[in-house]
Amino acid sequence: MAMRQCAIYGKGGIGKSTTTQNLVAALAELGKKVMIVGCDPKADSTRLILHSKAQNTIMEMAAEAGTVEDLELEDVLKTGYGDIKCVESGGPEPGVGCAGRGVITAINFLEEKAAYEDDLDFVFYDVLGDVVCGGFAMPIRENKAQEIYVVCSGEMMAMYAANNISKGIVKYANSGSVRLGGLICNSRNTDREDELIMALADKLGSQMIHFVPRDNVVQRAEIRRMTVIEYDPAAKQADEYRTLAKKIVENKKLVIPTPISMDELEALLMEFGIMDEEDMTIVGKTAAEEPAFCSL
């Protein structure tokens, strides 16, 4: 099969890296050849695959060597669980330079060194936060990733980020082949969460490709720097990631999304009872200004 390049986006702290690493571990279990490219200065996109605190990054090693041209592929590419190939782009020191530049440098380096020509089935880009700048949007902008998956939850800001990312996809979809593959709901146990994300996906013209329930086994595995697939392969949560992997392998629904307005998003939250219409009357009011509090 032809190599598929996928990027995982989502609100910061939503669980992108954990979801991505468990997903690729499940893909490896299916016999797929996979590479993860971490596009985050924290360099935590591969730690569960490599059982390490953080992988040495391309930007760090380039700084030590002099320039990125002084590096060889074997210097930066490591192999972990399930023969998954791992690369971290890295970034500058906090407060110095553009972290998005590290993503651009890393992807260009991997292409120049023919890293993608090793009979790979999948490349996954695990990307920092929202589409915050041109550097982090590179997998979309430069047509590196054809499939975008957004990790979200039933929380308003996670849904807001998913909608924003969809806007970024639309911006570049007409000039390239980038498409939205679906929303991955990484549950936060909010009310009617699966229904809400399915409704959001429908408004975006896409799908909720899988609902990943919340389970403490994920944290237990992370403490050991392992995926659930490796740590406890018999766990129900491991089967959830296996199901997600199979759905992505079989996914044919790749669309140019139809983002919605903030008003439409709030209306959706009201429809599902997450936000009450009356709440709009208390926006900007302090506790002292609210009658309910004044009477206490």
Swiss-Prot record:
GO biological process: nitrogen fixation
DNA damage is among the record's keywords: no
EC number(s) from the headed UniProt entry: 1.18.6.1
Cofactor note: Binds 1 [4Fe-4S] cluster per dimer.
Binding site for ATP: 10-17
Sequence positions bearing ADP-ribosylarginine: 101
Alphabetized Pfam families for the sequence: Fer4_NifH (PF00142)
Post-translational modification: The reversible ADP-ribosylation of Arg-101 inactivates the nitrogenase reductase and regulates nitrogenase activity.
MF GO annotations: 4 iron, 4 sulfur cluster binding; ATP binding; metal ion binding; nitrogenase activity
Residues annotated to bind [4Fe-4S] cluster: 98, 133
Catalytic activity reported: N2 + 8 reduced [2Fe-2S]-[ferredoxin] + 16 ATP + 16 H2O = H2 + 8 oxidized [2Fe-2S]-[ferredoxin] + 2 NH4(+) + 16 ADP + 16 phosphate + 6 H(+)
Signal peptide: none
Keywords linked to the UniProt accession: 4Fe-4S, ADP-ribosylation, ATP-binding, Iron, Iron-sulfur, Metal-binding, Nitrogen fixation, Nucleotide-binding, Oxidoreductase
SUPFAM superfamilies referenced in this protein's UniProt entry, alphabetically: P-loop containing nucleoside triphosphate hydrolases
Cofactor section: [4Fe-4S] cluster
PANTHER family in the record: LIGHT-INDEPENDENT PROTOCHLOROPHYLLIDE REDUCTASE IRON-SULFUR ATP-BINDING PROTEIN (PTHR42864:SF2)
Subunit record text: Homodimer.
Protein family per UniProt: Belongs to the NifH/BchL/ChlL family.
Purpose of the protein: The key enzymatic reactions in nitrogen fixation are catalyzed by the nitrogenase complex, which has 2 components: the iron protein and the molybdenum-iron protein.
This protein's name: Nitrogenase iron protein
Organism: Alcaligenes faecalis
Gene: nifH
